[in-house]
Amino acid sequence: MRLEHRGGALRGWEYHPASVPAAAGGSVLFVHGFGDSSIGPRQLFVQAATALTDSGLTVRSYDRLGHGTSDGRFADISIGDEVEQVVTMIRAFSADQGAPIHVVAHSLGAVESAMAAARVPDLVRSLTLWSPAGVVVDDIAVHDTIQGQPLAPVRDRGWFDFAGTALGRGFVDEVRDGLDVYAQARGYDGPVDVLHGTADEIVPVEYGRRYGELLSGATFTAVEGADHVWSSVPWREQLVDRLLERVRERSGR
């Protein structure tokens, strides 16, 4: 699949249910995290998509610019532009399906999806946030780090080495200039499900709880022992079972 955004191509995939006409069962858009791809951490989105399509849902996921097989460079990403990319995804998918869609997002993608949903609330039937990484603001603006690594090299050479991939100064400067990821999410008042592991080593569980308190339609669940990428079969089964239950409720099924 291909979607245009500001001269670049977002590439992704779509799974269709075998026994239900397109759009009849509902639609789910997955949004990946920082430095990840459309399949999610360790194929989390693919695993979930299989269960969702078996239940009659259509599932779509894209690589954002600078990620996966999409155009662009990771060095050029910014949260603001990634929010606009998610808005573009939501508009395209809801137009194709002729109905609002469910948005499910992980980590920084969850932060950006909450902001995007507030811009197009009528197109988002529900929002599910897994391990929302609101910590990105405190990490950069307060602690001068990204995932525990110091940002001093950015000032010296203009880029941050993120696991072998260069992240540009623009991403850091945008946050330091006062980006408020919470204020920009408040405009979405639809149903929200926030799940966060108590042993998340990247984003402390308090950040998930904050989204649960901030968004008027939100419920918050702390999953005992779960890490940032939900790296056990029981944790992932819990995520998918909960997602199926909520989507059915909100789709009137």
Regions found by a protein language model. Give the residues of each.
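N-terminal cap/lid segment of alpha/beta-hydrolase-fold proteins
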Residues: 1-26
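The alpha/beta-hydrolase serine catalytic core
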Residues: 5, 10, 116-118, 122-253
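Short, surface-exposed "cap/lid" segments of acyl-processing enzymes
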Residues: 18-63
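Short beta-to-alpha linker loops that shape the active-site pocket of alpha/beta-hydrolase fold enzymes
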Residues: 34, 58, 63-68, 73, ...
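Conserved catalytic-core motifs of eukaryotic protein kinase domains, centered on the activation segment
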Residues: 40-42, 70-74, 205-206
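Catalytic nucleophile-loop/oxyanion-hole region of alpha/beta-hydrolase
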Residues: 67-98
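Short beta-strand immediately N-terminal to the catalytic nucleophile in serine-hydrolase-like folds
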Residues: 103-105, 130
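Gly/Ala-rich beta-loop-alpha elbow adjacent to hydrolase catalytic centers
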Residues: 105-113
